[in-house]
Swiss-Prot record:
This is Octopamine receptor beta-3R. It comes from Drosophila melanogaster. Autoreceptor for octopamine, which is a neurotransmitter, neurohormone, and neuromodulator in invertebrates. Probably also acts as a receptor for tyramine during ecdysone biosynthesis. Required for the biosynthesis of the steroid hormone ecdysone which is necessary for metamorphosis. Involved in activation of prothoracicotropic hormone and insulin-like peptide signaling which is required for the expression of ecdysone biosynthetic genes. Residues 757-770 have a biased composition (Pro residues). Residues 396-406 have a biased composition (Acidic residues).
Amino acid sequence: MSGVNVADLLATTMTLPITAAAGAATSQAAATSATNASHLQPATLTGHISTTAAAKTTTTPTSSLPITSQFVDASLTSLSLTATSSDASYSSPFSSYLSSDSTFELLSTVGPNITANGSDIAVDNQAELEESWLDLSLLLLKGFIFSSIILAAVLGNALVIISVQRNRKLRVITNYFVVSLAMADMLVALCAMTFNASVELSGGKWMFGPFMCNVYNSLDVYFSTASILHLCCISVDRYYAIVRPLEYPLNMTHKTVCFMLANVWILPALISFTPIFLGWYTTEEHLREISLHPDQCSFVVNKAYALISSSVSFWIPGIVMLVMYWRIFKEAIRQRKALSRTSSNILLNSVHMGHTQQPTSLSYLHPSDCDLNATSAREETHSALSNLEDMLQPATDEDDDRDECDELRVPSPPPRRLSRSSIDLRDLEQERYEKVTHTDSAPSMMALQQQQPSHNQLQPPAPVFNPQIWTEGKMIPSKELDKEHSHPNGPQQQLSLTSGSGNSEPEPESTAYRVFGGLNSDESEGNDLYDTHLPLAEDNKELKRLIEDNYLYFKRQTGGTIISGPGGGKYAALSETDFIRLKAGAAACGRKAFASSDSEFLRTISESRALPEQPVPGKEKGFNILSLLSKTKRSSTECFTLEKKRHQANSEGSSFFRRSRNRKLSHSYNGCGGGKERKLERRQRQHSDTDSTPNKPDILLDINVLSEQSGASVIQQFSDGVQLIDFSELKTPPERIRSDDELAQLADCFGESPQQPATPPPSLSPPELPEPSGLLIASSSELAEIFRSLSFPLGRPAGAPQRLSTLSDQVCANYLMSPPNTPAPPAISVPNGGAMDSSASSNAQSASINVYFLSPPPHAAAPGYTPSDTSTVSLDVVTSLPMPVPVPQPNPQMASQSNISPKPEIILDSTLSPVEGCGDEHRDVTSPLFKRKDSAGDADVSVSGNGGAGGVGGVGGRQGRCSILAGYDGIQTVRKRQASVVTYDVNVINFSQENSDSRSYIPMGRVSTSSAKHEFSNKSSLIRRGGICIFVDEEEAEIIEQRPRGITFAAVPSPLPKCPLCGADISSTTGTTANATATANADSTIDTTVTTSSKRSIHEQTPDLGQRPASSSSSTRFWHKRTAAVTACWQQSKNRKRRFKTGCSHCGATGGSVRPAKGWKAEHKAARTLGIIMGVFLLCWLPFFLWYVITSLCGPACPCPDVLVVVLFWIGYFNSTLNPLIYAYFNRDFREAFRNTLECVLPCLEKRNPYNAYYV
């Protein structure tokens, strides 16, 4: 019975099912059986105890080893106590043996097993702890990735919707699909990604029930399919917009777009909600498994649903998108090729027409030049004359010189088209313009000039002479040759023959022309002497023979007055009709042939031989009449009208018109010619103002260069030119008019003369000025009166001359035709004529105050004021003249107050530039002409910002908000027109005084409220009728300027050529500096002048603060230098990468094409953006749908890891996040809209701009 008690004790203490011990105790077997049972029972118990203990310890890994040992020791103690206190009535041999031996055997067996199990438990606990930390890290990482994708998708697509709603520019039909796509992507993130993330983060358990499992699967399929169908609709929209643009407005209407969007949102419901809730999508086994395990939400589909849903959701829309974008890509490539071919042909045709300059029909322009049919004659001379343009190329490698060196031309065949694709409206316009500008003479011949031989004049080639012409040419009287050389130093005369527009007879004597003021008669282009006479090619003997015959024939007709000097002579080519007459024997028919030229003819050849020109008294100080009336920006239509009026032989009155020597109007008015420096300056000034087109004729360049030259050089340079004026109503011969007193008075108006008008002429106020096109001068007295009234006579010849030019920004508001096309060069203010030393006088000779003037101010008669011989009046823009007020002793601090405006109504440009004061000299610091090669300028100019009202923005005095206005007092700077990237519309500020009877003068300039001038606050008499007021937050400007910006350089004009499209520098073998690139950026809206002044003012005020310790300032300078060095290294590496990339980095133009190389339209750019979206869509969803179809068709035969399935799902979801990022990166309109929206929604992202402009 003891065995039964031991079994009961073990069952209650150890909870072990010891069934073998109970069976052995209840059996009443024999002694042998009992003995065997007693030997087997302890071993069985020991095995059960050990295994049970091990199982117990392994099933409770959190329990510690001492607790387990104590529990076993207590069990063993109770076990021994029970064994020893058994009942005596049950004493037997079996019980006595069990009580004595089994207890010690049990203890000896359990002890070693417990020690071994304790070591195994410690190792298992450490390994499981490491696995738990790894699982927790993976869980946190997955949660971060899932939440980031979801937030980016929701916020990005919401930003797309808000931006389109706020920006009216984005409200186009295509963006309707974009907004709908953004809505679908945002719902994918909210309804599909969130449920999937919860399942993955919870270990695969579904916590929302079976119904929500179906909802989740339906929403996932629905929104994903809707997003893909939106991309398909966008591709169709782009296809019609680019490939079929004519059908696009008819097909893509609002009704069509609404119908497409309705299908996009309805069709996915047919493959998502309906089959999933009805149970059509899966198998019966999967439905039973879902009912048995509601905590599982797996999406298992059958083969039919897999094929249908994948086709509707991905395969069909993907194929449609591929086809559409392939067609779009092919069309875009075709258009780009056509665009490139057209641009190349336009360039070639422009060069071709620039050399030929030949209208298409000579008989149309001049139907009566010759009476014989020229068709056969043209065919005979075509072989010799068609290649002249190849023979007359200039001896330079630059392409810019080719279009200018077209002075000596013989007619060539009409320019032919190089390809069919080159037909362009600009070609037709160019051809029409060439017809208009060369109506005077179709061949555009060069008039023969008698000049002194120079070192590079043409050498007479070895000719093949016509014997008859050569014999007649040798019979030239020697007295005429001596008569020709009798006046070597006098002004040279332009000799030519005349041909009327109606017939080929000479014009009558009454319509002869006379010479006036030959000083500057050639439109400031006398300096291109060496550019206009080209060397003849030596490789075409036939061409040389024709030119030599032409020269000798013309020499014979003019009586042999033109000879070849020691250095060679200049040859004038006749027109094509004269060549025809020469070959047809025109000399025998009794008709005198005339050579047509572009300039007006002075007189017949006989008169020119009989009456050589005498020097005009006072001609050294003559005045260019063309700078008064002919230097206006006329369009081609106006020029054509003027030339037609000139050719009409009627009595409408006299008029005069002049053109440059065989130059196009665009070349003449843009100042072409004069060397490479002039062309470089023209490129730099071409895009200074955005209020005019780059190719608009500009008359100010030639005048400005002319005004900066000394009088002696001008006389020497332009002594060969003549000025042509038509005095048809005069009955006196031309030589008598030249010696008349009126002409002397006319010349004295611009020379040294004591005559001064005390007051401005009342008849020439700005509204009463005559129109440039309708100005008629009947006599020289009227012309002299106009000149005298529009000029400033000398007041004191001994004083320093006050140079005047025709560039200014101070424009009269009541007579404004168009603003100047070029920026203002540096201005120099000469305070006093008597108080000026020789160095200041020399500086005044080299620079100029660039102003327009209409009438002299009251202080114009002050001593020291002297107009130069190049003073001009432009009828295009008339402005007021700020003149210095005479001060006995000039004060450098108050020198800038002398600039005042004599007009109460002014127009101020919105681009403001500071003026540097260095002694008596004032310069425009930021003007691009400050660094001109022909003007002296310093490399570094510092602008002081403290004291008075100095400094832009008034960074001197007290901190706060100050305004930049124009007032009466406190003038420290002068408004100058400058070239800047910050250009607005013309801002008009009109000032007037109440109860003012007499003309008052209001000074111009910037006045700061933080200045020491307290009387500026009294503006009771100031009436502002409208203008721009610029406010500067000085504290914010100081914060911005204190930020380290690296190395900054002074703005210097770039030597690189300018892009004809955007005005930026065209990069060559080396890159430009970072400052030049930043300056050319048109998106920078901060005024550079204000920035420069604020920066320099802050740098000047920093040493005065004295609040920083020496260590802090030294460390700041150290890090500033380090930052500057890193910036410079980065810029050098960037330039090194762009070393071999030529062309404009802004618009893509390479310098030769008229259009940009990357000139896609807006539709092409939208197609490119959406094409990138389509590519990203394919990369994201294609792997998922491949897995989806393969696993659905194969079933259990194609197993796939769960991790791969999760990765494929979230790659597809990531497509919804990438779409807004693609919009922001590739589409500039969306990028700007995103920036504006973020600045409005999030105030912390708003840029703090201290410069604000308000319209008052």
